[in-house]
Amino acid sequence: MRFDEFIMERMGYPWGENEPDKQTRRQAFLVFRQRTGRVDFASLPTMHRWFGLEKYHRPSRQAVFQMAFAMGLDREE
């Protein structure tokens, strides 16, 4: 599972059969920003790539841990 699929599902936007369109990805990104208190884990263009808004880029391990703590995810998630 790619990170964009994982994080979008956590934000309440499951993929289903087809990849979501850009508008759905943007909505998931905005929910993510709200849930994390608008913390800048990286630059905005980089975070957009985590959601596949322009290109795709997987976040660093450190950024993933920071996001997990900010969202209150448990160890298994």
Mark where each language-model region is.
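A broad structural signal for alpha-helix termini and local helix breaks/kinks
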Residues: 11, 36-40, 71
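Short C-terminal boundary/hinge segments that cap the last helix of small helical domains
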Residues: 72-77
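Short, basic-rich loop-to-helix N-cap that marks the start of a DNA-contacting helix
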Residues: 54-70
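Recognition helix of helix-turn-helix/homeodomain-like DNA-binding domains
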Residues: 38-59
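Alpha-helix N-cap/N′ positions at the starts of helices
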Residues: 2, 6, 42, 59-62
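A short, Lys/Arg-rich alpha-helix, primarily the initiator
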Residues: 1-35
